[in-house]
A protein has these predicted regions:
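Positively charged n-region of N-terminal signal peptides that target proteins for export
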Residues: 1-4
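Bacterial N-terminal signal peptides
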Residues: 6-15
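Cys-dependent protein tyrosine phosphatase-like superfamily
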Residues: 18-185, 197-291
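Ser/Thr-glycine-rich phosphate-binding loops at phosphate-binding pockets of nucleotides
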Residues: 190, 194-195
Length: 291
């Protein structure tokens, strides 16, 4: 009897021990990732994300919307707190020329121009403000080019050769960066599609699973949704445009990731086959940016 009781107690102790060793599921919240900028939208970091038994180092990997209106205070913050050493600009040439980046301190600037057909103003059409641009998108919500953007934007990013070349340049430069010299910052116009895809690829290279990649992408929706709910939409097509082009649409993004998996097996395989990021390069990135 005593021996049986002893065995039961031992099993209970083992069970309790196992339970206390379980890693709690990480809770990804927008407020925890924001980096304190007031003059740039969707400004956050990848730092703090748990990947297996390791985590991404804080204050090194920053992602934002355009920084063409960066305030003096925010520029100082990026210099003093984050020591930003390099800016990666994924906006198209026309976007960058019409609203040049405000470069914090002596940060190096690299243009990684990526534009979509009809997504940037290569014509004579100019918008005085974002409200005017939003109004135009909603007005032409049923136009084939606008609808194509809604359904195939991420396919263009992941599968078009010109887009892949842009992300090859991103990783090639990132591999030259020394974390001890400070953070890197990448952005596009809204910091959700081109910059968001860069974040997804980098997270995959660092060993993140689909759940974390999607959680990070969805933070853009969490950021923009409070703004878009104030904008009136009258049709389902307008709602689709609002959710995809002005906010962020995780469903459309994940559909592209599913296509990547179907064709290449995984996002990491895609990185190796299409972007040229070898397993050895991934190890370098993990050693630099994980702790």
């Amino acid at each position: 009897m005593i021996r049986t009781l002893s065995i039961i107690i031992s099993i209970m102790v083992m069970l309790v021990s196992c339970q206390t060793n379980v890693v709690e599921e990480q809770k990804i919240e927008l407020k925890n990732q924001l980096i304190g900028l007031t003059s740039a939208h969707n400004a956050r970091q990848l730092g703090g994300y748990q990947i297996g038994s390791r985590r991404i180092k804080d204050n090194l990997l920053l992602r934002t919307a355009k920084i063409s209106e960066l305030s003096k205070e925010d520029s100082t913050l990026l210099c003093d707190k984050y020591k930003v050493q390099c800016i990666y600009d994924f906006r198209g040439k026309e976007e960058s020329l019409s609203a040049p980046d405000v470069i914090p301190g002596k940060a190096r600037y690299l243009s990684l121009a990526l534009s979509f057909a009809g997504s940037e103003s290569e014509s004579d059409t100019k918008f005085e403000n974002e409200q005017q641009m939003i109004g135009m998108l909603l007005q032409y919500a049923d136009h084939p080019s606008v609808q194509a953007m809604c359904t195939s934007m991420y396919d263009v990013i992941f599968f078009e050769e010109l887009s892949q070349e842009v992300y090859r340049q991103f990783f090639a430069d990132l591999l030259t960066v020394k974390p001890e010299d400070g953070a890197v910052l990448w952005h596009c116009t809204q910091g959700k599609d081109r910059a968001g895809s860069a974040s997804a690829m980098l997270l995959a290279a660092l060993g993140a699973d689909r759940e974390l990649i999607m959680a990070d992408f969805t933070l853009s929706k969490d950021y923009y949704d409070p703004m878009t709910t104030k904008i009136k939409t009258e049709t389902e097509l307008q709602k689709t445009v609002m959710n995809t082009l002005i906010s962020a649409n995780p469903v459309v993004f994940e559909a592209t990731l599913d296509k990547v998996d179907a064709k290449y097996g995984s996002l990491t395989n895609y990185l190796t086959e299409c972007i040229g990021v070898t397993p050895e390069m991934m190890d370098v990135l993990r050693n630099r940016f994980l702790e």
